[in-house]
A protein has these predicted regions:
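Active-site-proximal helix-loop-helix substrate-binding element of RNase H-like nuclease domains
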Residues: 2, 13, 17, 23-41, ...
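A short acidic/glycine-rich loop-to-helix N-cap element
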Residues: 2-8
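Short acidic, Gly/Ser-rich segments with clustered Asp/Glu that frequently serve as metal-coordination loops
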Residues: 62-76
Length: 221
C-alpha cells in the first residue's frame, strides 16, 4: 500500500473493502470456492432433449448461452458456429449446433427466458446469423438481456482484468485455462471443444450472479 499513489490507493481500498465484505460473509465465500467443484456437463442426447423441454415449460428462467465459432465475424460466410452450451448454473448441456439447430432457434425466439452472454453484442450477431441461415424470421429473435463483460468493466475499468479467465480466478479462486487453441478451433477434437464450451457457459452464469448480488448489496448500503 502506498497512500501517496492515488491510483494504487483506489485499488487498495476497493480490494480491501471486497476482502472485508467477504470476511463478513463466510458462508457466501465458501459457496464461491465450491462453485468450481460443482461443474459438470452433459452431451447425452436424451438429457439434452429433456433440457430443452424443461426450458420451454419453465418460464422466467435465467440461462447462459455460449457459442464456439470459427471466427469473430458473424457476417462472413467463411465463419460459422460450431457448438453451443447452455447453463442454468446447476445443469449444463453442450452440443454440436447442427444436431439441434431447429430446437435451438426456437429457444432463441422464446420470450420467457432471461439470457446471459459473455458479450451480448457477439452472441446477438451470431444468433441472428443462425436464424437467418435457417430461413426463419430474424425479427422473432429475443435479444440477450445480461452481459457480464459490460458489468465487469463497470466494476473495474482497468485494461486486462475483464477476460473470463481472470474473472473466474478473481471471484472463484479457480485457475481456468481453456484446453483448446481458439485460432484453430475448427480442427480441435470434439470432446475438448465441448468441455471448453460448457465451462464458458457455466462460469459466465455464475459471474453474472456474482455481479447481480454485488449490485444488490450496493443498493442496500
Amino acid at each position: 500500500r502506498n497512500p501517496d499513489d492515488i491510483e494504487l490507493e483506489k485499488i487498495f481500498l476497493r480490494d480491501f473493502r471486497l476482502a472485508m465484505n467477504l470476511i463478513g460473509q463466510r458462508d457466501k465465500l465458501e459457496a464461491r470456492l465450491n462453485i468450481g467443484k460443482s461443474f459438470s456437463y452433459s452431451t447425452n442426447r436424451f438429457e439434452i432433449q429433456n433440457y430443452f423441454n424443461n426450458l420451454f415449460n419453465r418460464r422466467e428462467k435465467r440461462i447462459c448461452i455460449d457459442y464456439e465459432t470459427t471466427g469473430l465475424n458473424a457476417y462472413s460466410n467463411e465463419e460459422k458456429v460450431i457448438s453451443v452450451a447452455i447453463s442454468d448454473g446447476v445443469s449444463t448441456v453442450v452440443f454440436m449446433i447442427e444436431d439441434y439447430i431447429d430446437l435451438f432457434i426456437e429457444l432463441l425466439c422464446f420470450s420467457y427466458l432471461d439470457k446471459i452472454a459473455q458479450s451480448a453484442g457477439f452472441e446477438d450477431k451470431w444468433s441472428r446469423r443462425l436464424i437467418k441461415d435457417a430461413g426463419k424470421d430474424v425479427g422473432s429473435f429475443v435479444p440477450f438481456s445480461q452481459d457480464i463483460l459490460i458489468k465487469s468493466f463497470l466494476l473495474n475499468g482497468r485494461v486486462g482484468v475483464n477476460n473470463l479467465e481472470f474473472l473466474v480466478w478473481r471471484y472463484f479462486g479457480i485457475e481456468f485455462k481453456g484446453e483448446v487453441d481458439r485460432t484453430k478451433i475448427a480442427r480441435e477434437a470434439e470432446g475438448a471443444l465441448l468441455k471448453y464450451n460448457a465451462q464458458d457457459a457455466f462460469y459466465t452464469y455464475w459471474l453474472n450472479e456474482e455481479f447481480l448480488n454485488f449490485a444488490e448489496r450496493q443498493l442496500v448500503h
